[in-house]
Regions:
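Thiamine diphosphate
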Residues: 1-181
Length: 181
């Protein structure tokens, strides 16, 4: 339990994610740096439970988590929307045919006032790509839904040996409220 939870404050979304990952034995975390995911990444780095790898590209992160799964270790790939845009080939040629329960946590960009046209275009294609690949995906918009969705997505991915994507809405991460770009 964190100090601020002990003091009566609610857990932050990133504290909940860390707790649920640990409860479900997800030890390996790969990520490409992202401002929205920075609070989660900082907490994960601070916790000796996790093995953390920061590859150069999201495709490498997928390969690392896939290899770890084949060796008996559970892992997750953290990325932003534009990073997901680089993954369809790796998903279609490695993850899906091999039935790898790849967990992806994606910070959603390109919506709710994001002014970067590239992010907007990628955001519009992300869910259709996930759906066309039959990858279970759910957006998390409220702190009270974090535990339920993350827990269920992890369990479902491993029970069905299928990839799963958890999309962190700006409504959850507060990016849209603070005018971040």
């Amino acid at each position: 339990m964190s100090a601020h939870v002990a003091a009566g404050f609610p857990e932050s979304w990133e504290e909940i994610v860390v707790r649920v990952l640990k409860t479900n034995a997800v030890r390996l975390v790969t990520y490409v740096p992202d401002k929205v995911l920075a609070p989660l990444i900082k907490r994960i780095h601070a916790d000796d439970y996790f093995t953390v790898i920061c590859p150069a590209r999201e495709e490498e992160a997928v390969g690392i988590v896939t290899g770890a799964y084949m060796a008996g270790m559970r892992g997750i790939v953290l990325m932003q929307t534009s990073g997901f845009a680089t993954l369809p080939n790796a998903l279609a040629s490695l993850v899906l045919p091999s039935r790898i329960p790849l967990l992806m946590m994606i910070s959603e960009r390109g919506t709710l006032g994001d002014f970067q046209l590239g992010q907007v275009m990628v955001c519009r294609t992300m869910r259709p790509i996930l759906d066309s690949m039959n990858i279970e995906n759910h957006a998390i918009e409220r702190p009270e839904d974090v535990e339920f969705i993350v827990e269920r997505m992890i369990r479902q991915a491993y029970a069905t040996q299928a990839a799963a994507a958890m999309i962190l809405s700006p409504l959850l991460t507060n990016r849209a409220r603070h005018g971040e770009r």
